[in-house]
Amino acid sequence: MNKSLIIFGIVNITSDSFSDGGRYLAPDAAIAQARKLMAEGADVIDLGPASSNPDAAPVSSDTEIARIAPVLDALKADGIPVSLDSYQPATQAYALSRGVAYLNDIRGFPDAAFYPQLAKSSAKLVVMHSVQDGQADRREAPAGDIMDHIAAFFDARIAALTGAGIKRNRLVLDPGMGFFLGAAPETSLSVLARFDELRLRFDLPVLLSVSRKSFLRALTGRGPGDVGAATLAAELAAAAGGADFIRTHEPRPLRDGLAVLAALKETARIR
C-alpha cells in the first residue's frame, strides 16, 4: 500500500451525472460539498462541470466555465487544492488561469494544439485511457489483452506530451474504468487486478477511479446510490495494489478502510 496515497473527492457540478446529478449544480451546494469532502479526508477536490455518463447531453465550455467559476474562487480562498475534470481545452485553460493543481482529462489530452499552453503551466495532468473518444459509451472492449491496449495508448500519449515540452514528472496515468473500458465488468476487474503493470512499465503514478462505476453495479445488481460497499471493496483493492491516487465520492469510509489496512500491515510486520 502506498503511504502517500492521495484521495480525490468528487464534486459533480452537473444536472445529469449518474449518481448525484443536480445535487451540486448550485454554487453554494457544490462549495459546501467540497468542504464536507475535505473534512472527511479528501486531499484534492475534483470538480466535474459535465457528466461523462453515456446518456448525458453535451455541455459547452462556456457552460462548464460558468459552473466552476464561483466554486473555484471559493475553494481557492479556502486554500483547497482543486482538480478540473474536463476534456475541453477552453475550460482547461480557464482552470489553469485560476491556479488549479490538476487537470483530469477523460480523453487523455489529445489536442496537440493545446500542448504549448500545458507546457507553460505547472499543474499535474491526469491522462486517462479510454476505448472511445469523449464520454463513456456502451461498447465492447477491444480484442486482445486490454493491458496491451492501455500500454500502447500511454506509450503514444506520453511521447506526444513530453515531446511538446511537458515534463514527465507532471503526468499521472488513469487506465479508465467501467464504460471507459467497455461494457463487460470483467474488463474493469482485470485492469483493477493488474494496474501495477502500468506503474512498473512507465514509472509514473497511477490514479484509479472505481467509485460507483458501472462494473460494480453490474456485479452486484445495485443502483448507483447503493454500491457504497462494492465501491469501498474495489478502492481498498486499488490501495492494496499500490495506487497512488484514488478518486472517490466518499472519502470517509475509504480513510477508515485505509487505516485498517495499515494497522493489519503493521501487525503482520511485528509478529
From Swiss-Prot:
Amino-acid positions noted as binding 4-aminobenzoate in the UniProt annotation, renumbered to this chain: N12, R247
Binding-site list for Mg(2+): N12
UniProt keyword terms in alphabetical order: Antibiotic resistance, Folate biosynthesis, Magnesium, Metal-binding, Plasmid, Transferase
Pathway(s) per entry: Cofactor biosynthesis; tetrahydrofolate biosynthesis; 7,8-dihydrofolate from 2-amino-4-hydroxy-6-hydroxymethyl-7,8-dihydropteridine diphosphate and 4-aminobenzoate: step 1/2
PANTHER family documented for this protein: FOLATE SYNTHESIS PROTEINS, FOLIC ACID SYNTHESIS PROTEIN FOL1
Misc: The sulII gene is located on various IncQ (Broad-host-range) plasmids and other small non-conjugative resistance plasmids.
Name the record gives this protein: Dihydropteroate synthase type-2
Originating species: Escherichia coli
Lineage: Bacteria, Pseudomonadati, Pseudomonadota, Gammaproteobacteria, Enterobacterales
